[in-house]
Amino acid sequence: MAEEFVQQRLTNNKVTIFVKFTCPFCRNALDILNKFSFKRGAYEIVDIKEFKPENKLHDYFEQITGGRTVPRIFFGKTSIGGYSDLLEIDNMDALGDILSSIGVLRTC
């Protein structure tokens, strides 16, 4: 059930972030991603409160990413980790290039 909930949201050419809106790390990750202009349908924010029981979702995240916490961020079907991983990529000024390379950003 958790696998289906996650996997049906992960597609190539899309950024998917699983969050709890009450989580400060999730809000910080959203702030970073919201600096970019995504193509329609290329960015999805998933509130994990939609899934019950939530602990099963955390178990599945740990199984596929090595981490149980949110945010869990995926570029396509590949997990890039959580907030600290996203922040590190952003601090290296590489995030825009990565997002461009997977085809999720709008072009003028």
Swiss-Prot record:
Q: Which cysteines are joined by disulfide bonds?
A: C23-C26
Q: Which domain of life is it from?
A: Viruses
A Gene Ontology term for the protein's cellular component = virion component
Q: Where is the Glutaredoxin domain?
A: 3-106
Give the location in the cell.
Answer: Virion
* Induction description: Expressed in the intermediate phase of the viral replicative cycle.
A Pfam cross-reference name: Glutaredoxin
Where mainly found?
Answer: virion
**Keyword entries, A-Z:** Disulfide bond, Electron transport, Redox-active center, Transport, Virion
Molecular function via GO: glutathione disulfide oxidoreductase activity
* Functional summary from the UniProt entry: Displays thioltransferase and dehydroascorbate reductase activities.
Tell me its family. Belongs to the glutaredoxin family.
Name of the protein: Glutaredoxin-1
Its taxonomic path starts at: Viruses, Varidnaviria, Bamfordvirae, Nucleocytoviricota, Pokkesviricetes
Whichever gene encodes this chain, its name is OPG075
